[in-house]
Amino acid sequence: NLAPLDLQTPTAFDNNYYK
């Protein structure tokens, strides 16, 4: 879930995931 999503959207996902 995190791997494929991070690859497609490392910016928006990363921001939301980290926060």
Swiss-Prot record:
EC number: 1.11.1.7
Subcellular location, record wording: Secreted
GO biological process terms held by the UniProt record: hydrogen peroxide catabolic process
Domain of life the protein comes from: Eukaryota
Presence of the UniProt keyword Signal in the record: no
Cofactor note: Binds 2 calcium ions per subunit. Binds 1 heme b (iron(II)-protoporphyrin IX) group per subunit.
Enzyme class, spelled out: oxidoreductase
One term under GO cellular component: extracellular region
GO molecular function, one term: lactoperoxidase activity
Keywords: Calcium, Heme, Hydrogen peroxide, Iron, Metal-binding, Oxidoreductase, Peroxidase, Secreted
Required cofactor(s): Ca(2+); heme b
Catalytic reaction(s) noted: 2 a phenolic donor + H2O2 = 2 a phenolic radical donor + 2 H2O
Binding residue positions for Ca(2+): 6, 9, 14
Function: Removal of H(2)O(2), oxidation of toxic reductants, biosynthesis and degradation of lignin, suberization, auxin catabolism, response to environmental stresses such as wounding, pathogen attack and oxidative stress. These functions might be dependent on each isozyme/isoform in each plant tissue.
Family per similarity comment: Belongs to the peroxidase family. Classical plant (class III) peroxidase subfamily.
Protein name stated in the entry: Peroxidase 3
